[in-house]
Amino acid sequence: MLFRYLVWLFRFIEVKNVASISLLVIGSIYLTTAISNNISTTISPTTSSNSLTTAISNNTSTTISPTTTSSNYLTSAISTNISDKEEDTPFSTDKTVFDGLSPITLYRAIRSTLNDTMTDILTRPYRPTTVIFHSDTPQPVKNATQGNIIKKTYRQVLTFFIQPNPLFPCFKNHEVFLNLANILNTILCIILIKNV
């Protein structure tokens, strides 16, 4: 039984090899014929290069020089925006801060420790819906529509610290800014929780 199986297997392999070789020969004949028929349709490199040269020569009249109107517009825009440069002292995280602080610098120093969801009332219009995150409450207070009360109190507290005050004659270290930010954050969250 094993001998008959081996004989059948060898015959199958032999037939399979003959069939595969014949298919390979037939395929190579067709491939050779197809290649010989396509010799006349070869692409010469001069044809594409001539078309490219023609396209380049036709486009030479539309070259962009650096002195066109786009650069002039860019120069005028830059010169216009130079006057909008802010002259205040930038806030740094160092232990020492300059004595001459403008109101917007102090405001940004306090705002840097608060959340970005509070509206910048000195530079942008007020958004009536806002979300306040507080360190003591895990859930934010959403859709605070009592915007006028918040804005008024925030401005009053801010002007209290900005104006010359005997309690705070000058701000010289970073811890003062952090304490002020915590005070403002607590006041705002109390107002929100009471009025929402």
UniProtKB/Swiss-Prot annotation:
Belongs to the asfivirus I196L family. Keywords: Late protein, Repeat. This is Late protein I196L. It comes from African swine fever virus (isolate Warthog/Namibia/Wart80/1980). Induction: Expressed in the late phase of the viral replicative cycle. Sequence repeats lie at residues 28-48, 49-70, 71-92.
